[in-house]
């Protein structure tokens, strides 16, 4: 990909540039979810619902918390590098690249060790059923032993996307998915390692993707190049990255904590409900990967145009992206609800678990379009450096409100009364984020 092609984000037809960038991210997210889903399908069908709950229940929420935090922080690198790239500031691009990589290495090592040490305590705190504790601890510990690979890949992919390269992260995820599927079949079906086999397969696949993205950055000559000897934290760049990334990281933590609290309530309904929730989280991800791809696309688009000083493209690009995100959200809701029984049947063959999953989908799926407002507007605001208020809206309007709802309802509520916290908090967050976005854009464009 040449420099001229990358600059199409600041010069080309807006809807085309958004879609050119969007589709590789979407397909990449699909393959990333594919190897996670393959774990769940193979474990659920060939090991059992208890093993499925061990892989995707409380263990999955813990993993999401840590990985989500770092992914949030990595958006700081995406925004900073995209702005420098749009402004054609080569020295700043190089410094921010090496700072981001150093942060990924240190973060992966420190949090990986912490996860291994504290896995039992975290799972017990989440009211994980006693019969699931041993395998859940095993899965979490193996996963966290390779956390550094996950951090390296996520940061490297974020850097490539920041400069407009969304294709190579896709290619690496395809390779990673193939490796994971082959190892799943080997370590679960041929060598019956159960949950351990699923964890090892994921770890090795993530290591492969980390190596591939690192080699790409080392030998990339257009725009930037990673030199291992220059990996260090430049204070100025670290401050800039963390100024944007930390609020996003804490936002991700709040999402995860609120989801963990929901998971604790789900656990109280028993193993069948836990298995249904795990399966639903895999089906539900179809929406999240599409929505997230729009969020990443608008963040990179706005970031580069912000660096280039093209304010009208920022406004028009955000509107176009929102329209596409809303159409996609409604379409996904209709498709998932039309095929709900078939989709749950892919993961489990227990009729009771399938019925519980259908109840979950009928509550949550109709409200997907609400989150499109939150994803697109927060991405556009973050790309312009406006992170504090948008993060507070998410943390309070969605996460804190969700925790309060579940805490008040969980003791005596039905399953539907617990999980309706998602549509309620999305509605509150969408309204608040839309109001703030309109207010902030008026101020920015009046000042310009």
Show the residue positions of the predicted features.
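Short alpha-helical transmembrane segments in multi-pass integral membrane proteins
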Residues: 1-22, 81-146, 190-246, 302-367, ...
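Residue-level signal for short hydrophobic patches within transmembrane helices
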Residues: 11, 15-34, 38, 62-69, ...
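Transmembrane helical elements of multi-pass membrane transporters/channels
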Residues: 20-39, 142, 153, 176, ...
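Transmembrane alpha-helix boundary and packing residues in multipass membrane permease domains
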Residues: 25, 29, 41, 79, ...
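Helix-terminus/linker motif at the lipid-water interface of multi-pass membrane proteins
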Residues: 34-53, 123-130, 186-195, 253-282, ...
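Small-residue hotspots at the loop-to-helix junctions and early N-terminal turns
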Residues: 47-61, 136, 140, 199, ...
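Small-residue-rich hydrophobic transmembrane alpha-helices
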Residues: 52-113, 150-169, 276-340, 371-394
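Short runs within selected transmembrane alpha-helices of multi-pass transporters and secretion channels
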Residues: 74, 142-161, 169-177, 198-213, ...
């Amino acid at each position: 990909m040449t420099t001229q092609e990358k600059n199409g984000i600041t010069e080309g037809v807006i809807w085309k540039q958004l879609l050119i960038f969007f589709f590789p991210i979407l397909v990449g997210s699909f393959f990333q979810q594919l190897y996670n889903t393959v774990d769940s399908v193979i474990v659920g069908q060939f090991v059992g619902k208890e093993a499925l709950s061990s892989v995707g229940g409380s263990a999955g929420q813990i993993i999401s918390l840590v990985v989500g935090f770092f992914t949030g922080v990595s958006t700081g690198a995406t925004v900073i590098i995209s702005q420098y790239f749009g402004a054609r500031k080569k020295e700043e691009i190089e410094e921010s690249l090496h700072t981001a990589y150093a942060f990924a290495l240190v973060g992966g090592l420190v949090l990986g060790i912490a996860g291994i040490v504290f896995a039992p305590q975290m799972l017990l705190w989440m009211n994980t059923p006693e019969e699931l504790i041993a395998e859940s601890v095993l899965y979490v510990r193996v996963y966290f032993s390779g956390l550094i690979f996950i951090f390296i890949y996520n940061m490297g992919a974020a850097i490539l996307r920041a400069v407009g390269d969304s294709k190579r992260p896709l290619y690496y995820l395809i390779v990673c998915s193939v490796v994971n599927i082959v190892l799943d079949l080997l370590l679960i079906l041929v060598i019956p390692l159960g949950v351990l086999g699923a964890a090892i397969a994921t770890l090795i696949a993530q290591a492969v993707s980390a190596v591939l993205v690192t080699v790409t950055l080392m030998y990339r000559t257009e725009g930037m190049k990673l030199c291992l000897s220059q990996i260090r934290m430049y204070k100025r760049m670290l401050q800039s990255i963390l100024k944007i990334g930390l609020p996003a990281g804490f936002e991700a933590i709040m999402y995860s904590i609120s989801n963990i609290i929901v998971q604790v309530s789900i656990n109280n309904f028993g193993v069948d409900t836990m298995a249904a929730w795990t399966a639903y989280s895999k089906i539900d991800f179809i929406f999240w990967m599409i929505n997230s791809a729009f969020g990443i696309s608008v963040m990179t688009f706005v970031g580069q145009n912000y660096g280039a000083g093209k304010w009208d493209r920022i406004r028009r690009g955000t509107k176009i992206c929102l329209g596409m995100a809303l159409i996609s959200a409604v379409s996904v809701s209709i498709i998932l609800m039309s095929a709900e029984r078939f989709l749950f049947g892919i993961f489990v063959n227990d009729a009771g678990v399938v019925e519980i999953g259908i109840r979950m989908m009928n509550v949550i799926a109709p409200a997907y379009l609400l989150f499109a407002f939150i994803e697109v507007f927060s991405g556009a605001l973050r790309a312009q450096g406006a992170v504090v208020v948008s993060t507070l809206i998410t943390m309070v309007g969605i996460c804190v409100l969700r925790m309060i709802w579940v805490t008040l309802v969980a003791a005596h509520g039905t399953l539907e009364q617990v999980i309706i916290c998602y549509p309620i908090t999305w509605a509150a967050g969408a309204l608040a984020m839309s109001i703030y976005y309109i207010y902030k854009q008026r101020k920015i464009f009046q000042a310009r």
